[in-house]
C-alpha cells in the first residue's frame, strides 16, 4: 500500500485564499477528508464566503466536518463538483444549523 503524500496545508491555503473576495480555491489539490479537516483547523479560513473544492477526493466525513466548523458559518457558495460526497453527506448539510447563509451548492452525481 502506497504511503499518503503529506500536503503542506498552510501553503495550499495561502495559495488559494483571496482575502479581498473572502474566497478559498482548493480545486484539483487531491484533498481527501483528512486534508479538509486540517484546512478547517486553520484560523486563516475564518470568514470565507466561497469555497471551491472541485476535483478532489472529499467524502461524507469531510463534508460533515465542514458543516460542523464554526469557521464556515458565513459560507454562501460551496463547490463540491467531482468529489466523493454521497447522499449521506448531503443530508448532513441539509440538516446543518450552522450553514444558514449557504445559497449556492454545486455537486456531481458521480462518486
Where do the model's predicted regions map?
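Short, solvent-exposed loop/turn at the beta-strand->alpha-helix junction
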Residues: 3-9, 29-37, 56-64, 84-91, ...
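Hydrophobic anchor residues at the C-terminal helix/turn of individual leucine-rich repeat
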Residues: 39-42, 66-69, 93
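Charged low-complexity stretches with an acidic bias
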Residues: 64-88
Amino acid at each position: 500500500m502506497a504511503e499518503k503524500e503529506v500536503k503542506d496545508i498552510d501553503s495550499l491555503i495561502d495559495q488559494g485564499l483571496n482575502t479581498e473576495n473572502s474566497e478559498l480555491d482548493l480545486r484539483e489539490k487531491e484533498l481527501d477528508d483528512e486534508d479538509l479537516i486540517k484546512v478547517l483547523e486553520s484560523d486563516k479560513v475564518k470568514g470565507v464566503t466561497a469555497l471551491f473544492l472541485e476535483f478532489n477526493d472529499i467524502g461524507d466525513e469531510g463534508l460533515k466536518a465542514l458543516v460542523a466548523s464554526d469557521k464556515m458559518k458565513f459560507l454562501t457558495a460551496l463547490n463540491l463538483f467531482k468529489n466523493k460526497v454521497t447522499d449521506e453527506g448531503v443530508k448532513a448539510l441539509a440538516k446543518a444549523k450552522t450553514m444558514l447563509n449557504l445559497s449556492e451548492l454545486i455537486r456531481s452525481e458521480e462518486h
